[in-house]
Amino acid sequence: RYQPEFYEDTKTYVTKRTSSKKLTQGLNLYSQNQKLINQIENEFKVEKELMLALMGIETNFGTYVGKMDILSSLATLSFDKRRSKFFTDELITLLQLIESGKVDYKSLYGSWAGAFGFFQFMPSTIDNYALDYNGNDKINLKNNIDAFASAANYLSKIGWKKERPCFYKIELNKKIPSKYLNTCLLYTSDAADDVR
């Protein structure tokens, strides 16, 4: 409800979460895992820069993954009338992942909303996209090998195209009241000309 991604426009959100310190952290993580990250980039056709940026935004490169027991979080949230079905489905999926042995229930600490690992996957995302990339018969999203491969697999499967722009300059219909377009206008006015 009170998460900044819901009340800050994209430009403000990204600017507040990027710094030269964070850039240095990302470069250090890349240099320590260069072979793995390059292999995953080539296999899944997802840029290493995108994966590192997402990990930096989501968990500060794995240094803050959350401390909440996500089983308890999801059980509690499943009683919240606003999104009861969503969180109940996530809870059931998590229980199925535990029962099947795909995830270790002792490691399931993450966000208050039930997200887990270096890239903050919800249980349904784990179920649909996470990979046991190191072949140890467990999906460990707090391990760089499984985490990067799972993030790349997720992005690839939802349609990410390497070296294609993710934003396009658009012409806004002047009949649409600007109060509905503020986030779009604020972001696109500064960033649309800078797409890669």
Sequence positions of predicted segments:
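An acidic, Gly/Ser/Thr/Pro-rich helix-cap/linker signature
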Residues: 1-32, 38-41
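Substrate-binding/active-site groove segments that recognize
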Residues: 69-78, 91, 115-131, 151
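Solvent-exposed, acidic/flexible segments
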Residues: 23-34, 43-44, 63-67, 80, ...
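Secretory-pathway/luminal and periplasmic proteins that interact with or process carbohydrate-rich
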Residues: 1, 59-68, 80-84, 101-106, ...
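A structural motif
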Residues: 95-104, 113-133, 158-164
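Single conserved hydrophobic/aromatic residue that forms the stacking wall/gate
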Residues: 187-196
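Acidic, glycine-anchored loop motifs typical of Ca2+
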Residues: 132-141
